């Protein structure tokens, strides 16, 4: 499980241990509509919806993009994101790595359908939650074949 050893991580509250199963509780986010926004009068002040892009995702993307060219700024973005989740900042001899950023992205985007695309982009192995089996990354897994009709009728 992603949050096994991180007791102070707020995202642990997204899960509930059932009888032998782990269930994800976080499925829909709510957005607060500010009082002076130009919205229809029948809208309630909080609306259900699906995030298109999280601020925390932007911080993780920025940390990954800067990791090799501006380590201090990458660390600043990473620490800003993780501290907003109740985690202590990285300091001292703990060096920020691509794997740490990937794991943080995986935790932050759990259940939102984005992790697979990140795994594909980074060509990561897939570890099954069901039986802990590792499926090696390959084109067979990540590349969808072009249908034959596309070749037959494209001219």
Each predicted region: which residue ranges?
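Acidic/polar-rich alpha-helix caps and helix-coil junctions
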Residues: 4-155
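His/Glu-based metal-binding/catalytic segments typifying zinc-dependent metallopeptidases
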Residues: 1
């Amino acid at each position: 499980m992603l949050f096994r050893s991180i007791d102070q991580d707020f995202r642990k509250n997204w899960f509930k241990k059932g009888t032998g199963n782990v269930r994800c509780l976080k499925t829909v986010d709510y957005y607060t509509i500010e009082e002076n926004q130009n919205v229809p009068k029948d809208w309630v002040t909080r609306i259900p919806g699906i995030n298109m892009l999280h601020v925390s995702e932007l911080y993780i993307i920025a940390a990954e993009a800067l990791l090799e060219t501006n380590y201090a700024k990458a660390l600043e973005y990473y620490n800003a994101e993780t501290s907003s989740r109740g985690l202590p900042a990285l300091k001292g001899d703990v060096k920020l790595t691509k794997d740490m950023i990937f794991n943080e992205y995986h935790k932050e985007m759990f259940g939102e359908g984005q992790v697979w695309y990140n795994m594909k982009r980074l060509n990561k192995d897939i570890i099954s939650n069901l039986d802990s089996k590792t499926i090696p990354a390959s084109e067979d897994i990540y590349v969808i074949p072009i249908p034959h009709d596309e070749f037959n009728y494209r001219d």
